[in-house]
Amino acid sequence: MSVNLDDAPLYPTFDPGNMLKTIRDLPEQVREAWAVAQDAPLPDAYKEIDHIAVGGMGGSAIGGDLLKGLMERRGTVPLEVVRGYELPAYLEGERMLFVASSKSGNTEETRSLLDQALERGMRVVAVTTGGKIAEQARERELPLWTFDYDATPRASIGYSLTLLVGLASRLGVLSGVEDAVDETVEALRGLQSKLLPQVETEDNPAKDLARKLEGKLPFFFGSGFLTAVARRWKTQMNENAKQWASWDVLPELNHNTVVGFGLPESVVPHLVVVFLRSNLDHPRVKVRWEVTKDLLTKNNVLAYEIYGRGESPLTQLLTLIHFGDFVSYYVTALNGVDPTPVENIDYLKERLAEVE
């Protein structure tokens, strides 16, 4: 039986953990995180840095990916995101800043990176709600940026990104942020009013796109500062809707992925591509979007496009994330699954704990 996304009683039945509330909270997460960032501890010596590395995993790492996109447009120092147990060999010394990003404060990979950063004499900031990372930060008298929000890491994206944006702003390595935050909060509120469950499908673009993704294998394409947004859409489909999804990036995909658009023939009817676009894209990338769409059409692959809203890169980035979170939520309803639990991740952690 087809699921009616306009049936209000539907949502509490598959969402007992109220993931919807955390999605709706995004504008307030951004506002509150920005306020926290203005008063969080940051020694003046930290402003003498040449490089930033954000260490994290999963929902605690994506904020770093998103900040990287913003820094590539308006930043004055390079930023990289480290996922895993080992810092690159070139990261060492007090002119490099390591940011330990872990909502729980207990992520084993991030704890390993933190230990290495301290051993190598790097400046360190901890961004967390508590756990062992917070304990270590207090013991070592490191700047500790804490927030209190009861949700999964992926549902705390407003904090994990905006705290990092605030840190970059206070370090003096990212400009023009304060006005962008105000614009973003207002844009998110306006967008949300069009995407909530009480807005019927014919007037709700998130529900409409979710219907088009139902039963399909979605690919999300981004470019430039929206590259990490494509990754976010993919991981939200994985974790919320409990299904396969993938992502790719222009212009790189024009040099490889496009060659495989037509095969296997048995798979092509099940594919759908979503372009995540910006009016700030490079002019040649704008041309590439159109040609890529033509190639998909020639190979009988459905493609849709969504644009970020607002003027600033931050606003466009977060409005696309907000849209994608609602889309994944409605696909979750269509799939008949609970968006909150991540049983396979829990299983992995249990197995890993057995061999510590």
Question: What is the predicted role of each segment?
Answer:
Residues 1-18:
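Polybasic, low-complexity association/targeting segments
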Residues 15-22, 29, 37-41, 47-50, ...:
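Active-site phosphate/pyrophosphate-binding segments
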Residues 35-37, 76, 167-177, 241-242, ...:
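Short helix-capping/linker segments at secondary-structure and domain boundaries
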Residues 46-193, 211, 278-300:
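Glycine-rich phosphate-binding loops that contact phosphosugars or nucleotide phosphates
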Residues 82-83, 243-254, 302-311:
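A generic structural motif
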Residues 258-343:
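C-terminal active-site/capping subdomain that shapes the small-molecule cofactor and substrate pocket
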Residues 340-356:
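Short, small/acidic-rich helices and loops at N termini and domain boundaries
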